[in-house]
């Protein structure tokens, strides 16, 4: 087995396969032990490698993880971006090769500055800290790509009880720590005290997760709200067709009008496929309908802002009519889907760079939440729900979470189910109910433990009815966010860095 930790292709190919295990630990497969196995193989494969070899070992791991785990990007480019098979494949390979460096650079840093092969416990802790730092960096760099976090594998796993304490971050940290400790345990057997401490570090977090699973961190803030969510199942090729606007508006109106005994009616992202000011008459009429039902109607709609120079800016928005108020403008935009980086260079090259409604502006920070039926509703439009810290900031001010999306871009791939799993994790982190309304699935209601209690199957038009309970109180994660865990990771990385620089006789303090 020593070949695993040696430079060269055998180890690189194993790293590629180990990375490809990542999506199997997540939705829709949910074989969560594979997250530990995947990271353990990477950790073992980096042992003893020099910096350059470690960089490529990490790159191959990342190529496997993103190549298998974000294969839905090919669907978006080919099926909806009108790119040919060769071009879509080339763009997908280029994207995967680029994001694989998210793992390559930390692997190089690990080999050059942090790894201490003679200190099994300290090495495992530092590796887990570096893994956490990597996931944090991925959520921020170039607007972020916080996909395929190891911690999502624990949505309903043994570590689910730790998620309200430290978010998906804590789950990822424990998984990485467990992977490294399992690799290092054989080296601890001759040392009784170190072995005991290693077992405590390995088993303690899992025991704590099981103990806290199901603990109620929040409590009811009022009577249940009766919810109706509409899943229109509009084909993407019809979505922005001007000739189909009236049919879409009529569809959502006709599905909503018969609904009785309802507090909230929710439509998906851009369910109203024309600008808010152009749809003012329609929205006003639907607001009157909602008022007559003593309900609030919440819908996705693009919003235009006219500027002083006569130009306009466009936003992806959510608005409330009826017994509620507020319009929210999306802050976290999808590259190429909602805006085009370097658009002066890329616009017009291929159809993928000229998708409909791909010129949105970013909404301002610190927007007020939506209000409906007397409660504060935290809104997340599509991609925004995958950002843990961003979502937590809004959730802490709210009693109910709401996410609207159009996952038609993913086709029949695993993308929509990965997206749903991340939404479920936001509910678990915050201890709040979440309403999820999508164009073609999965529309559902999620309880404060991240469980789906009602849903409409994908690719079907349907009406979901159910209840959500407004919640109050803050989970530890909403109170303190990632900062305590990030501080711990910083200390562990500094500890490893200092331990690496000391003379051998001084390293015992840091081992």
From Swiss-Prot:
Membrane-spanning parts: 7-29, 58-78, 90-110, 125-145, 163-183, 192-212, 482-502
A GO term, aspect molecular function: N-acyltransferase activity
EC class name: transferase
EC identifiers of the protein: 2.3.1.269
Pathway: Protein modification; lipoprotein biosynthesis (N-acyl transfer)
Keyword annotations from UniProtKB, A to Z: Acyltransferase, Cell inner membrane, Cell membrane, Membrane, Transferase, Transmembrane, Transmembrane helix
Subcellular location: Cell inner membrane
Gene Ontology terms: biological process: lipoprotein biosynthetic process
Residues at the catalytic site: 269 (proton acceptor), 330, 382 (nucleophile)
Membrane topology according to the record: Multi-pass membrane protein
SUPFAM superfamilies: Carbon-nitrogen hydrolase
Matching PROSITE patterns: CN_HYDROLASE (PS50263)
Pfam families (UniProt xref): CN_hydrolase (PF00795), LNT_N (PF20154)
GO-annotated cellular components: plasma membrane
Annotated PANTHER family: APOLIPOPROTEIN N-ACYLTRANSFERASE
Function: Catalyzes the phospholipid dependent N-acylation of the N-terminal cysteine of apolipoprotein, the last step in lipoprotein maturation.
Descriptive protein name: Apolipoprotein N-acyltransferase
Taxonomic source organism: Pseudomonas aeruginosa (strain ATCC 15692 / DSM 22644 / CIP 104116 / JCM 14847 / LMG 12228 / 1C / PRS 101 / PAO1)
Gene that this sequence comes from: lnt
């Amino acid at each position: 087995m020593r070949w695993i930790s040696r430079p060269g292709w055998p180890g690189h190919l194993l790293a590629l396969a180990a990375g490809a295990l990542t999506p199997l630990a997540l939705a829709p497969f949910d074989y969560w032990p594979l997250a530990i196995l995947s990271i353990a193989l990477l950790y073992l494969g980096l042992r003893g490698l020099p910096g350059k070899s470690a960089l490529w070992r990490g790159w191959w791991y990342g190529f496997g993880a993103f190549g298998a785990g974000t294969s839905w990007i090919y669907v978006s480019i080919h099926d909806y971006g009108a790119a040919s098979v060769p071009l879509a494949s080339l763009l997908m390979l280029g994207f995967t090769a680029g994001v694989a460096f998210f793992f390559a650079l930390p692997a190089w840093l690990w080999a050059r500055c942090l790894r201490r092969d003679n200190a099994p416990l300290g090495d495992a802790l530092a590796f887990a800290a570096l893994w956490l730092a990597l996931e944090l960096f991925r959520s921020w760099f170039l607007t972020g790509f916080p996909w395929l976090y190891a911690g999502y594998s624990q949505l309903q796993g043994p570590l689910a009880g730790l998620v309200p304490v430290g978010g998906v971050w804590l789950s990822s940290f424990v998984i990485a720590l467990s992977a490294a400790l399992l690799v290092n345990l054989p080296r601890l057997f001759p040392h009784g005290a170190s072995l005991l401490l290693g077992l405590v570090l390995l088993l303690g977090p899992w025991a704590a997760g099981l103990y806290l699973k199901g603990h109620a961190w929040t409590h009811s803030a009022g009577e249940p709200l009766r919810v109706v969510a509409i899943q229109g199942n509009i084909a993407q090729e019809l979505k922005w067709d001007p000739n189909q606007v009236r049919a879409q508006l009529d569809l959502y109106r006709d599905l909503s009008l018969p609904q009785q005994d309802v507090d909230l009616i929710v439509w998906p992202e851009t369910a109203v496929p024309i600008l808010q000011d152009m749809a003012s008459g329609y929205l006003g009429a639907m607001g009157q309908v909602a008022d007559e039902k003593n309900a609030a109607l919440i819908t996705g709609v693009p919003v235009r802002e006219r500027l002083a120079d006569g130009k306009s800016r466009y936003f992806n928005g959510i608005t409330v009519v009826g017994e509620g108020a507020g319009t929210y403008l999306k802050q976290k935009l999808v590259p190429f889907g909602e805006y085009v980086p370097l658009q002066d260079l890329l616009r017009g090259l291929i159809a993928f760079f000229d998708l409909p409604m791909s010129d949105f502006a970013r909404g301002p920070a610190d927007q007020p939440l939506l209000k409906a039926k007397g409660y504060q509703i935290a809104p997340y439009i599509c991609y925004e729900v995958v950002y843990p810290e961003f979502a937590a900031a809004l959730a802490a001010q709210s009693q109910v979470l709401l996410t609207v999306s159009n996952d038609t871009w993913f086709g029949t791939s695993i993308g929509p189910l990965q997206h749903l799993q991340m939404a479920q994790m936001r509910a678990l982190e915050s201890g709040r109910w979440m309403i999820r309304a999508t164009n073609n699935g999965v529309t559902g209601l999620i309880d404060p433990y991240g469980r789906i209690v009602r849903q409409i199957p994908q690719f079907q038009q349907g009406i979901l009815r159910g209840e959500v309970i407004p919640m109050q109180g803050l989970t530890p994660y909403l109170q303190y966010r990632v900062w305590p865990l990030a501080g711990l990771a910083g200390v562990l990385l500094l500890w490893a860095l200092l331990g690496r620089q000391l003379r051998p006789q001084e390293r015992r303090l840091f081992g």
